[in-house]
Amino acid sequence: MTATVTAPRGAFGQIVRNEARLAWRQPAGLIAGVGISLGLLIMFGEVSAFRQSSARLDGLTTFEIYLPILIAFSIGAIALIYLPGPLVSYREQGILRRMSTTPAPASWVLAAQLVVQACAMVFSLLVLLIVSIVFFGASAPKNVGGLILAIVLSIAAMFTIGLTIAAMARTAGAARGILAAVFYPLMFFAGLYYPVQLMPGIMLGISHLTPLGASAQALVYSIYGGFPPVQSLLVLAGYSLIFGYLARRLFRWE
């Protein structure tokens, strides 16, 4: 009779710690997700004209408009720039295949990556909100429940898209190419380069149907007093379900 070999207690926690150390040593994705968004927030906050309300921006200031956009940017950058790379590299190097011969399943590496990067996202969001409130006089989020729901769905949508890219890309170089082709257009429709409120009708409609556009819209509503639009939540949930299914079907461990 063959004995079943189980992973030692605490093995998953050790994998999470290892992935966290690797993320700290190779912080490019974390810098993109945390550093760039924080730098842009400070830059916008230091421009006095950006703190004056505008009728063209639905009565909000430019700074207030960009806070939720930068939160969406942070989520997208970590999920799309940092998540696929290590997973594709592990597959290229045969690490995932070798783990299948150990008591710890290869899926634990994937789960550990998600834990580390979810923590990085939450840290980034807290930093952006705290800095905006403490140093630039932004009001605290009005609808905390709606904000949490919007953040959870945004993270789920972007994680599943990132995992699908990791599933499709055969090499780390191919993953970077796909990411560049996906991330920057998504950030355009989220309003990073041009405020969504000023987009013409067709582009505005497209924006609301993209994951980061829907995320930014849901965040705007929840931060400034309302519940996120149902359409935005459904769009994010739809991306999570569709790309979650694709990632599961397409992901290869070797």
Predicted regions and their residues:
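Transmembrane helix-boundary elements of multi-pass transport/secretion proteins
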Residues: T4-A11, I15-Q93, Q113-M121, L125, ...
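Alpha-helical transmembrane segments of multipass membrane proteins
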Residues: E19, I42, L129-V134, L163-T164, ...
